[in-house]
Structures are given as C-alpha cells and as structure tokens.
C-alpha cells in the first residue's frame, strides 16, 4: 500500500474526533470584537486630540485678532514721538496676555516683528522677566513665510525644548493695521502668537505610549486605510495619523489563542498520542532512520545514505537524496577547487595561500627554516598588450608549471615543503619550509626559479622579453604573520626591480628604511608644497673658450621641512612613476618664466635658459598650451628658451606631438644625456632638435677607455646637421681643452660654475669678471660662438 493511502486511513478518524473547527470559529469571533473595540477607543482618543488642537487654534486666533483690532499697536505706530510708547506697548502686551490667558500653566507668547522679520518686542506669560523669543520659533517663522508667502498663517511645530507649539503670524500694514495690498518691508510688520500645546502634547504622548507608535503629522490624508490606522484633520490641509504597533493587538490575540489552546490542548493530547502511536511505526520510524543517515552525511561520517528499495514515498525519497548527495559531493569538489585555486594556473589563490600559510606558521618548529618569496614578472603587461591575452595567459601557465615542478623537485631533493600561489595578475608567492641544515635553500630555489629566464633556455619563458624579480622575507625575523611576511617580501621584490630586475633581494631593515623614505617622498610630493619648499638653481654654460656666457640651465632643488634636502635623483623618478611630475613641470616652467626678466636684468643682456621636460609629459599637447600662456603672461620670447629631453625618450620623438608643437612655436629643443642611450645615426639625423648635450658619464667613459678621439666625428656629424653641441660635467682644464680642441660649441660644469640661486648670480658674475681681467677688455660677452673661437 502506498504511503499516502496508509496515512489517510490512519489520520481520518483522528481528524473527525478532534473537531478543531469549533476552536477556529470562537477565535474569529473574539478577534473581530477585539478589533472593533480597539478601533473605537483609538478613534475617540484621536478626536479628543484634535479637539485640544482646535481649542489652541481658536486661542491663538483670538489673541491675534485682539491684537490686530485693539488700539495697542495702533497707538504704538501713531505716537512715534512718544518716548514711552515702547514701554506702553510691552505693558499692554503683557496685560493682554493676562486678560486672555485661559490657563495659568499654558505658555502663550506675543511678538512683533518688523518688515525685515526682525524681533521688535516680545512678551510671554511666564515668570521670567528676561524671557526671549525662542530662536527656533523665529527661524521657523522666517522659513514658513519664505515658503508660503502668505500674509497670515497658522501651523504646528516644536520649540527648542521639544514642546509642541501652535504658531500664528499675521502681516499687517503699519498705517491701516490690516492686510497690506503689497509687500513692502518698510510699511509692514508681523504679529506673531504662539502657544505651547500642553494638553495636546500630554494626550499625544499618552496615545503614543499606549500604542507604542508615534503620531505623524502630514499635509495630505492617508491614501488608504489599513488595520487600525486612524487619521483626523486638525486644520485644513493638516492631518494627524496614528498607526498602532501591530504587536499590541497581536499580544491580545495571542492571549486569546493561549486560552483556546489550553482548553483544547487536553483533548488534542489524547488525539496526538493516538496518532503518534500509529504513525511512529508506519511513518516516523522510517523517516527518522533516513534523517539520521542524512545527518551522518552532513557530519562527514559517511559519504552517502543507504538507498531503500521499498516501493513507497520514503523509498523514492531516499533514492532521490542519494542521487542529490552524489551530485552535491561532485559539485562541492569542483567548487572547492575553484574557490581555493587560481582558475588559470591551478595554483592556490591568495586566500587559500594565506589560510594554509597561517596554519603552517602556527605549527612551525625550531628545526625548520621558513621563507616567503614574492615574485613579479617584469614587462608582463607589455607582452600581454603587444602579443595578446592568449600569449599572456600561456606565459602565466608556463611559469606556474615551472614553479610547481620546481617545488616538487625540491621536496624530493631537499626534503622541503612548499605552498605556491598566484596572488594576482603577474604576481606569485611561494612559502618554502626546509630542514635547519639547508641554510641556503631559498637562495638555490630562487636561482633555479630564474634560470629559464636568465639563461634563455628552450622554454616559453625565454621567447618573450620578460624577466622576474624576487623578494624574500624570513620567518620569524621579518614577520611572525603571513601578512607581514608578504608585505616585507613585496618590499624586497621592489628593491630587486629597482636594482635592475631579473634578480633576487632579501628584506632588511635598511631596505625598509629606503622604501619608507620613498613613501615619505611620495606623500610629501602629493602635498604640493612647491612654493614653500621648492626653489630653482641656475648653472651657467659657456662657449668653448669659456670666455662668453651663453645661458643657464634651470635645476630644481627641494629643501623639505620633514625630509631635509631631497636630491632630484631621488624625487624625480618617484614623481614620474606616480604621475605627479606634470604638476612639478608646470611649476618649474612658471617659476623660470617669472624669474627670467630678473635673470636678464642681472646679466644685462638677453640670456638663454634651458629647462628640462619630464619624459612623462612628452605626449601632452596641453603642456604646450600651458607654456605658451605662461610665455605671454611673463613676456618671455620663445627664442630665449631651450627645452631639454633625455636621449632615451627623444628616440621616439615622432610619437610625441609636444616636441613638434614646441618647435613650431619657436622654442629650442635639446637632446639631453646623449650617449646614455642607444641612438642610431639615422635617428640622430631625423631628430627635430637644435642642440645635442653629451652625457657626463659618456665623456668620463671615453676618457677612462682612452677613446677621446671618438668625440670628434660625433661633433662633426652634429655640425653637419646644423646642431650645436654642449658638453656637461666639465670639471677640469684638461677636459675643457680636449673638447675645445674638437670644436665643442658649449661647455657646462663645475669648472665654469656651480648651480646658484638667483641672488648668487650677481656676486658670481662680479667674481668671474675679476678673475678674467687678464683677458682683453670686454671679452666677457653674451653672443653665439664662432668656429674660430674654438680653434
């Protein structure tokens, strides 16, 4: 027999004996009576509340009408020459309050405002002789008049003490004491009356307390009525709404339910016992058995339930549960793998790595070494963008495979335990645990990790221009928790990048100080205190003879209040990497243009000024527009200015519209640090520049390798392209003479002059002229060099 048939035959006699329908009928009847009685009570209270409100409204209106129609105010405005009119007005206002006061405890206030809504006089029926108009009421009157623009208005609000009040104002003409025909602040005044709604407030609080629900005040009636909701119109367009808390009526209904349940509980108990006795054997026991098996599955005490072969609902239910748990187990294993592992590389993800690492660190032993390695694939974004995401993904998979295989090899050869993970993008982490006897295990592991990239082995990793930088942190010296170890390993990794990439760096306190200083520099740059802490220095450069001053190179100096002196070698790369150098470039250009007139006044001739441009700004036409505006503002001729760009970025000048725009506007362009990059002869010929500046290290290298004669053909090539040549870093007479013999056009270096502030240039010029007194008179001039001068 089917289970549903068997249950029907077993429970039908019990249902007939219970006769539960009678209890439902009784409950419904009592519920309706309770709701009707409660509704009547609430309606009576809300109407009583409205009655108090209307009484107060009548009181306020009577005060306002009495004042408007009485001679009190008329005498005040008509007897302007009476010196006692103000005292009489105040006395009359207080007398009016006492005459019309219906209740000594009820606070009533009378005020007169001028046309500018400023308080003239105030009186109230309190015992405080220094009472003043409540500022919240004053603000409300102004807001109410501004929003309604009515000549007369009565409305409800609360004062600063949180008391319910009813406020009425009437705008009257000072001459007619009636409603003005037009609004002129000089000819009108306001009569303001407000009364504290004590009875209204007491009743409202009692209703709210009894019903555990606030009374809402609104300017529109409720759109529909639900439950015991009550509403009453206090005045035209102003309603009070009460929606009692359902739990109050529900509590009373629950009380009725409990009484009914108690009365029918005894009779139902016998019925339940009979049902349980019958159902236990035929229904409950099989279900309990199934439930126990399901619980064991949930507690991982068994993999699945036993399938029942009975031909009934419980048998089919057990079969379906069996199939469902089989599918759930399979899905759980797949989901667990996705949640704990990176879907692309199949390595652990960041979350799983931290969970496993925390567990491992909590169980570490003194006989073990533990390292955390942070690995970043250098240039991966470039490869991913240039060759496509498919190539990028394959590189990540290849690197992950290499990491996984290396971990297995070390487990076999060095008895290590490792956890490898892909943290994000091109960043990986490895936690390596080795026995105490292997002190250099992390170093060997890192070297083998880099081997396919460094040695260009026959591996997918060697087919593309990517490298890897590795930072290593040691437990517990560099951190006792995985978060700290990862952070410090990341810091070491960035040090490896800064040292040239494709290498390994260990975390240390000194390294942390370097990183901390870099962060401090970045934070200080973001504050933008350029005018307070930045200043310009000017280093002169001369013709090849060293007799004629040609111009000055603008150099940026930073004296930070917090960091002390910060060299350009420190803060310029940080500014470029963080995108802040655009602001610094603009500050330098603006400051140099501002000071150029002073500079020329000092040297008494038009002078050339060279300004370095950040490589990060070379693709911005907006900078050219800024330069043009600054030049117009400070009266700077483009012919006075040279902009210097580094050789490494000048090689791609065709892609930098800024250079072509500056050249079009008439500014000079110079390739700075020539010799530090890899410029071909073709590129040198094609450069849209007028000057070449040889790098100091390039010149030092030629001297150190005894290849000084290499400089002559380079200078001749530049001259053949109508380019001037500047040599920087001249620090000795020998170096000066070498370059002068090869007809280098301009010289710059400590041999001729140090970087100076604007105020130091004039004394320096005077000292330089004094030293050069052995030359012919007036040799010190400011013209372009002739070729004969260098011979």
UniProtKB/Swiss-Prot annotation:
Gene Ontology cellular component terms for the protein in this record: plasma membrane
Ranges facing Periplasmic side: 24-259
Domain HAMP as annotated: residue spans: 281-333
Locations listed in the record: Cell inner membrane
SMART domains: EAL (SM00052), GGDEF (SM00267)
GO biological-process terms attached to the record: signal transduction
Top-rank taxon: Bacteria
Signal sequence residues: 1-23
Membrane topology: Single-pass type I membrane protein
Domain EAL residues, every copy: 518-769
InterPro entries in the record: Biofilm_reg_signaling, EAL_dom, EAL_sf, GGDEF_dom, HAMP_dom, Nucleotide_cyclase, Rev_trsase/Diguanyl_cyclase
Function: Plays an essential role in the maintenance and the formation of the three-dimensional structure of the biofilms at the later stages of their development. Absence of mbaA promotes the accumulation of larger amount of biomass on the surfaces at later stage of development, results in the overproduction of an extracellular polymeric substance that accumulates in the matrix of biofilms. This yields biofilms lacking the typical structure consisting of pillars of cells separated by fluid filled channels.
Residues passing through the membrane, by range: 260-280
Listed name of the protein: Biofilm architecture maintenance protein MbaA
Domain GGDEF: 368-509
UniProt keywords, alphabetically: Cell inner membrane, Cell membrane, Membrane, Signal, Transmembrane, Transmembrane helix
Cytoplasmic side: 281-791
């Amino acid at each position: 027999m089917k289970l549903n048939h068997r249950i029907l035959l077993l429970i039908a006699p019990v249902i007939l004996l219970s006769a539960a329908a009678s209890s439902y009928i009784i409950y419904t009847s009592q519920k309706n009576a309770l709701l009707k009685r409660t509704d009547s009570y609430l309606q009576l209270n809300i109407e009583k509340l409205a009655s108090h409100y209307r009484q107060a409204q009548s009181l306020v209106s009577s005060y306002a009408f009495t004042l408007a129609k009485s001679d009190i105010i008329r005498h005040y405005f008509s007897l302007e020459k009476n010196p006692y009119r103000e005292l009489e007005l105040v006395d009359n206002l207080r007398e009016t309050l006492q005459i019309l006061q219906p209740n000594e405890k009820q606070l009533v206030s009378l005020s007169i405002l001028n046309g500018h809504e400023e308080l003239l006089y105030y009186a109230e029926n309190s015992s405080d002789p220094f009472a003043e108009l409540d500022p919240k009421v004053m603000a409300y009157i102004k807001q109410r008049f501004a929003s309604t623009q009515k000549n007369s208005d009565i409305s409800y609000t609360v004062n600063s003490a949180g008391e319910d009040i009813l406020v009425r104002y009437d705008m009257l003409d000072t001459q007619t004491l009636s409603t003005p025909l037009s609004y002129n602040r000089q000819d009108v005044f306001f009569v303001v009356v407000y009364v504290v709604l004590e009875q209204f407030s007491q009743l409202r609080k009692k209703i709210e307390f009894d019903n555990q629900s606030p009374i809402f005040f609104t300017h529109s009636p409720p759109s529909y009525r639900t439950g015991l909701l009550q509403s009453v119109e206090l005045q035209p367009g102003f309603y009070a709404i009460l929606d009692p808390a359902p739990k109050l009526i529900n509590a009373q209904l629950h009380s009725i339910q409990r009484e009914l349940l108690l009365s029918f509980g005894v009779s139902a108990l016998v019925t339940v016992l009979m049902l349980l006795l019958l159902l236990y054997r035929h229904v409950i026991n099989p279900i309990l058995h199934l439930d126990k098996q399901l619980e064991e599955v949930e507690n991982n005490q068994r993999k699945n339930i036993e399938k029942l072969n009975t031909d009934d609902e419980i048998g089919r239910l057990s079969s379906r549960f069996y199939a469902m748990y089989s599918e759930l187990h399979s899905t759980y294993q797949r989901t667990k793998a996705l949640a704990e592992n990176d879907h692309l590389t199949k390595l652990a993800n960041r979350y799983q790595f931290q969970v496993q690492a925390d567990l491992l660190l909590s169980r570490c032993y003194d006989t073990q070494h533990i390292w955390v390695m942070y690995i970043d694939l250098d240039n991966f974004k470039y490869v991913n963008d240039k060759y496509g995401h498919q190539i990028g993904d394959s590189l990540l998979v290849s690197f992950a495979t290499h990491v996984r295989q290396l971990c297995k090899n070390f487990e076999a050869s060095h008895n290590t335990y490792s956890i490898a993970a892909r943290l994000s993008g091109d960043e990986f982490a490895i936690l390596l645990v080795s026995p105490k006897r292997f002190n250099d295990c992390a170093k060997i592991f890192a070297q083998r990790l880099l081997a396919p990239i460094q040695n260009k082995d026959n591996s997918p990793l060697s087919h593309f221009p990517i490298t890897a930088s590795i930072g290593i942190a040691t437990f517990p010296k560099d951190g006792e928790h995985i978060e700290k170890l990862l952070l410090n390993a990341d810091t070491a990794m960035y040090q490896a990048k800064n040292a040239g990439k494709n290498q390994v760096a260990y975390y240390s306190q000194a390294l942390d100080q370097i990183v901390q200083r870099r962060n401090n520099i970045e934070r200080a740059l973001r504050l933008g205190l350029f005018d307070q802490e930045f200043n310009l220095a000017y280093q002169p450069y001369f013709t090849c003879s060293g007799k004629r001053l040609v111009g000055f190179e603008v150099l940026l100096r930073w004296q930070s209040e917090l960091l002390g002196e910060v060299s350009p070698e420190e803060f310029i790369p940080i500014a470029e990497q963080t995108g802040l150098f655009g602001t610094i470039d603009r500050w330098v250009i603006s400051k140099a243009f501002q000071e150029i007139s002073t500079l020329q006044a000092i040297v008494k001739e038009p002078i050339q000024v060279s300004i370095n441009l950040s490589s990060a700004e070379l693709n911005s036409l907006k900078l050219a527009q800024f330069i043009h505006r600054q030049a117009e503002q400070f009266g700077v001729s483009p012919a006075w200015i040279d902009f210097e760009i580094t050789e490494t970025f000048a090689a791609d000048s065709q892609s930098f519209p800024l250079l072509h725009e500056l050249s079009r506007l008439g500014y000079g362009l110079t390739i700075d640090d020539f010799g530090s990059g890899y410029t071909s002869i073709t590129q040198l010929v094609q450069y849209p520049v007028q000057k070449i500046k040889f790098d100091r290290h390039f010149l030092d290298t030629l001297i150190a390798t005894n290849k000084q004669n290499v400089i002559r053909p380079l200078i001749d090539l530049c001259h053949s392209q109508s380019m001037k040549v500047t040599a920087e870093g001249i620090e000795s007479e020998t170096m000066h003479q070498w370059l002068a013999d090869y007809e280098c056009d301009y010289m710059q270096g400590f041999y001729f002059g140090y970087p100076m502030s604007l105020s130091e240039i004039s004394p320096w010029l005077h000292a330089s002229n004094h030293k050069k007194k052995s030359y012919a008179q007036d040799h010190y001039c400011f013209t372009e060099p002739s070729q004969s001068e260098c011979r």
